[in-house]
Design a protein with these regions (language model features):
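Short S/T/G/P-rich N-terminal loop/turn motif that feeds into the first structured element of a domain
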Residues: 1-105, 114-134
Length: 134
């Protein structure tokens, strides 16, 4: 079991609970954690999401966030974690393809200021329990 304390990103300060319908019963979540080699690199990656506009690109391509957070206490520091929601794996794959092809992402990814900000990525696909509130 892992425990952590996280703080929300400035650009998304609250949990976005997905609207649920009967068709959403098969929805899935993607929980991604980006580890950095040091606090300066981690701060730049958080800036990339906030001021750099990466969250806006997510929204533009259909990567629907539930939350974005920076870990204050926990394992593998420094790191940030975010969660996305999808109807199914096909929707997830299509949204990530749109993200990688987005011209704003291509420009942001080439910005030297944001180079070498992530040293490891953990990516977990989750299915919510029937009683899940998100």
């Amino acid at each position: 079991m892992e425990s952590s304390l996280k703080v929300a990103f400035d650009e998304m300060p609250e949990l976005a609970v997905p609207a649920l319908t009967e068709e959403d019963a098969s929805r899935l979540f993607e929980l991604r954690t980006y580890e950095s080699h040091g606090p300066t690199a981690a701060r730049r990656k958080v800036e990339m999401f906030n001021e750099g506009g990466e969250i806006d690109i997510f929204l533009d391509v259909g990567l629907t966030p539930v939350f974005f957070s920076e870990t204050l206490i926990g394992d593998n520091l420094p790191n940030l974690t975010y969660m996305l929601v999808f109807e199914n794996l096909q929707e997830r794959d299509a949204a990530w393809d749109r993200f990688l092809d987005h011209p704003d992402w291509k420009e942001l990814a080439q910005n030297e200021y944001y180079n070498n900000t992530v040293s490891n990525i953990r990516d977990i696909i989750l299915q919510p329990a029937p009683y899940s509130q998100i």
